[in-house]
């Protein structure tokens, strides 16, 4: 990094973090927030993507996690066909984007996938406002045509109903204010 003493690990780390903060971002759970304010309270339930990103932050797990992601995607488990995207992160670790199994919350999905993949669970990745820094094309390993794709209306309805039947909101984020077992799922309060 120009102007930074390569022998000063602390200065190099600080400079890299500064460069990282200049990268564009992507929200991993929602595509819309009220008043353009990225927070849990302002996440618009109808904009829930039904996908999440597993963030492999320990370099010792990257190669094994990459192989396991491919293996799980082809397995006869709930993870079959769920892999949406693989990329190296800004710090050359790994992001694994997956479609959430029907009825599972972000936290449930993250915990179950990490267990199946044999990688550490990172609870900081389950917040509605979570973002990931976008890296260059060379960092992309795999991209499904379904990544950030709009799900069919019937699938969205089925996924929302699966949450509602559990007493959760349509995005699985919290407790529904009232139970809805039939009808539409348009109210942001549900």
Regions found by a protein language model. Give the residues of each.
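Short, well-ordered, mixed-charge alpha-helical segments that flank or form enzyme active sites
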Residues: 94-95, 142
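DNA replication initiation modules
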Residues: 32-60, 100-189
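Short Gly/Ser/Thr- and Asp/Glu-enriched loop/turn motifs at secondary-structure junctions
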Residues: 88-94, 126-131
């Amino acid at each position: 990094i120009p102007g930074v003493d390569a022998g000063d690990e602390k200065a190099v780390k600080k400079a890299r973090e500064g460069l990282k903060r200049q990268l564009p971002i992507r929200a991993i759970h929602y595509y819309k927030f009220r008043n353009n304010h990225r927070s849990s309270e302002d996440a618009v339930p109808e904009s829930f993507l039904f996908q999440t990103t597993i963030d492999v932050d320990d370099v010792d797990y990257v190669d094994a996690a990459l192989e396991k992601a491919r293996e799980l995607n082809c397995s006869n488990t709930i993870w079959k066909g769920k892999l949406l995207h693989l990329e190296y992160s800004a710090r050359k670790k790994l992001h694994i984007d997956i479609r959430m199994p029907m009825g599972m919350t972000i936290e449930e999905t993250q915990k179950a996938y990490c267990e199946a993949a044999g990688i550490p669970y990172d609870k900081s990745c389950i917040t509605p406002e979570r973002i990931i820094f976008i890296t260059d094309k060379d960092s992309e390993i795999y991209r499904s045509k379904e990544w950030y794709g709009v799900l069919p209306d019937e699938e969205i309805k089925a996924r929302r109903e699966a949450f509602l039947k559990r007493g959760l909101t349509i995005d699985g984020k919290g407790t529904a204010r009232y139970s809805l077992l039939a009808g539409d799922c348009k109210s942001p309060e549900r």
